[in-house]
């Protein structure tokens, strides 16, 4: 629902989900509905929002932690973004479980980012983000933490050609990941040429759709037909 000042409220419910999503530590019990809501409020040159989500998790697929089919889980999120001289945003998420699962009991995520388009040639867009992830058996505990800094740059060479790069550094593991991508748009075909490097052991934070999960360095060619 949208108010006249552009504030809005979202409510949702989900059912039948089982697999992990994003940074989920545990799978979802698909027999128990999920539900949540979000309140978003406009601020000067931006907006801020508060979110809540509830689900029942299941630890039966992980052998080294206590086994529970139904683990009530409460998720709290706070995020905001502003357009000033640069684009600025932050995202925080706190996950509280009612069962003791050791270091997987509670999670905390803190992310800050910024983006800016430089007036170079056709315009080069640069995005910087830093993410801290904490796992602990104490709520808001920071004993087991991981820190990753990411940068993404994109430059349009022409209307049909673009070059971009994704770079990640894991401060905890001390390793570096990158993926440089050139793509050309034909009438019905999109062609991608990718050069990448991944460390031999890639953490879950560094695994995503933008950075492939093959270890080592390599070149990949991908052709996509659009119909």
Task: Explain the meaning of each model-derived region.
Residues 33-37, 74-78, 86, 108-113, ...:
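Hydrophobic, lipid-facing positions within transmembrane beta-strands of outer-membrane proteins
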Residues 196, 201-211, 217-220:
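Low-complexity, intrinsically disordered Gly/Pro/Thr-rich segments
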Residues 19-20, 59, 173-177, 200-204:
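Short active-site-adjacent structural elements
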Residues 182-202:
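C-terminal closing repeat unit and adjoining cap/tail of repeat-based domains
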Residues 1-141:
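Signature for the C-terminal beta-barrel architecture of outer-membrane proteins
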């Amino acid at each position: 629902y949208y108010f006249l000042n552009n504030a809005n409220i979202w409510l949702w419910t989900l059912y039948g989900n089982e697999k992990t999503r994003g940074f989920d530590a545990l799978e979802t019990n698909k027999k128990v509905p999920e539900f949540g809501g979000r309140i978003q409020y406009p601020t000067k040159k931006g907006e801020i929002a508060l979110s809540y989500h509830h689900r029942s998790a299941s630890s039966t697929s992980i052998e080294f932690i206590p086994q529970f089919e139904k683990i009530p889980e409460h998720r709290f999120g706070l995020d905001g973004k502003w357009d000033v001289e640069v684009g600025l945003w932050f995202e925080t998420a706190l996950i509280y479980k009612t069962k003791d699962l050791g270091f997987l009991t509670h999670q905390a995520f803190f992310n800050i980012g910024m983006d800016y388009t430089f007036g170079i040639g056709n315009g080069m867009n640069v995005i910087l983000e830093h993410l801290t992830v904490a796992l602990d058996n104490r709520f808001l505990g920071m004993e087991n933490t991981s820190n990753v800094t990411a940068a993404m740059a994109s430059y349009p060479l022409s209307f049909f050609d673009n070059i971009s790069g994704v770079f990640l550094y894991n401060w905890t593991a001390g390793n570096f990941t990158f993926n440089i991508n050139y793509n050309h748009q034909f009438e019905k075909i999109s062609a991608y040429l990718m050069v990448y490097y991944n460390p031999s052991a890639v953490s879950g934070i560094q695994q995503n759709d933008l950075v492939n999960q093959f270890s080592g360095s390599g070149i990949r060619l991908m052709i996509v037909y659009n119909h």
